[in-house]
Amino acid sequence: MANNNIMGIDFGTHFACVGIFKNERIEICPNQQGNRTTPSVVSFVGDDKLVGDEAKAQMDRNPLNTIYDVKRLLGRKTTDELFDHEVKKLSFKVTTYEDNNEKIEFQVNYKSNVVTLTPIEIATSILEQIKHTAETFIGGESIKKAVISVPTDFTEKQRNDLKEAATAAGITVVRMIHEHSAVALAYGYDQVKECSETTNESKESNVMVFDLGGSGVSASMIRVRSKLFEMIGNVSDHTVSGEHFDHVLVQHFTQEFNRKYRCDLTDNARSKAKLKSACEKAKRNLSNMTQAALEIDSLYDGRDFFTNITRARFEDMASGLIKGSINAVSQLLEKCNMTKEQVDKVLLVGGASRIPSVQNQLLNFFDNRQDILERSMNQEEVVAHGTTIQATILAADKSNQSLTCNSSNISMGAPFSAKFTPVTIGIQDSNGNLIPIIPSSSLIPCKRTFTLNTSSENQDNLNMAVYQGSAPLAKDNQLVSRFIFKSSPNPIDVTFEIDNNNTLLIKSEQANYSIKF
């Protein structure tokens, strides 16, 4: 297949990852240091701007001029509910625009000057580095297009800011897909292939994506049947994340150090950054070992800090976070009106999903069904793998070719559809709000059924206005069409379905409509 140079990018909170179709298979591109993920970090040192691994190395020694976690602040305003909470955890200076105190800027020392930079500019630097990584991997050939994954709860503003950053980095975003859709695609592609080769029957399964990553915990339910992927619900909670597990360790060791040396290291940005980095490493080690050591030279005022912690102690301190992460699972089941027995597989995503107690609690929740947790996927790479599959399919579409997949590679063959809805499709409620029916980045084909009720007695007709967009108020979105139903003493069930031809089918007992997008 001709290389149409569409890469798949996972722009993560802590790390970014990029994949490309090469040698008849999906490949995750290693960076200059040989690592398959690149830290989402930018550091300014004298006259140099460092990105990725080199920048992350500066977090301990140059914390005031090293920007990280930019994904959390992309598309945000200072008036957002979580802004103050997020900023308190950062070591660098966050300011606001002179002419707009709701807009966020970062202040650093660069080339002997005080420089202000926006979240978009920092994201641009990271995406430029990712683009360079992919281009180097394929021998220096230019790559100008990408599929980029976004969280399920990313707002339209956040999407637009990420797209603007990509454009500034020389990347055309041909599609944005939900991170969980990418995970399902990475997992389900082989399942679909296996099913289609072994039987003509339509095998249906309910797959839950459990994502405990740097920015929060989220869970999605995706129904898989033959070549149909249908996202039927998702929940997210930003009060529980891998970062919060790190913070548990940071608090614990800060108190231990302060007790031991009778001082307060929290007034020193460099000391806090060094401790945070060591705690991140300890958390990762505790997923594989029952005890982890911290060895930090000259942590504060020339004092070394050598200590350790057991996995049992860590999991006890983090028990509230672990319980909170499992709550997302029960909330998702309630939202989808499903029982835990109806879930066939749980896909684990995000570094913190490796914590043994998290996995044990998930197993307990699902009555110790040993085969329910899918542990074979690489949690750090699976989203990029899924976005790259989507990118490869789009490249094949442009070449009038199709794709199939086996356990090791992707090649031309029988067709497989993996398109996604570009925008949310919803209806207006009686208060003028948009009620999403089919979320953006839902895998196509997909369908949803909902109920219309009369809002008052003696109502002759039911009016339904259909919009596309993600703005909370319906009027701020694009009107698709208006429909009128005759009032009925019983609720009216309406089904929205988007087929492989991007046609919206609206079905009810009274009438059927079709709208081509």
Swiss-Prot record:
Stated role: May function in protein folding and assembly, and disassembly of protein complexes.
GO cellular component, one term: cytoplasm
Record-linked InterPro entries: ATPase_NBD, HSP70_peptide-bd_sf, Hsp_70_fam
UniProt protein name: Heat shock 70-related protein 5
Bilayer-spanning residue ranges: none
Top-rank taxon: Eukaryota
Species per Swiss-Prot/TrEMBL record: Dictyostelium discoideum
Family indicated by similarity: Belongs to the heat shock protein 70 family.
GO biological process, one term: protein refolding
SUPFAM superfamilies reported in the protein's UniProt record: Actin-like ATPase domain, Heat shock protein 70kD (HSP70), peptide-binding domain
Gene Ontology molecular functions: ATP binding; ATP hydrolysis activity; ATP-dependent protein folding chaperone; heat shock protein binding; protein folding chaperone
Entry keywords, A to Z: ATP-binding, Chaperone, Nucleotide-binding
Pfam families: HSP70 (PF00012)
Keyword Chaperone in record: yes
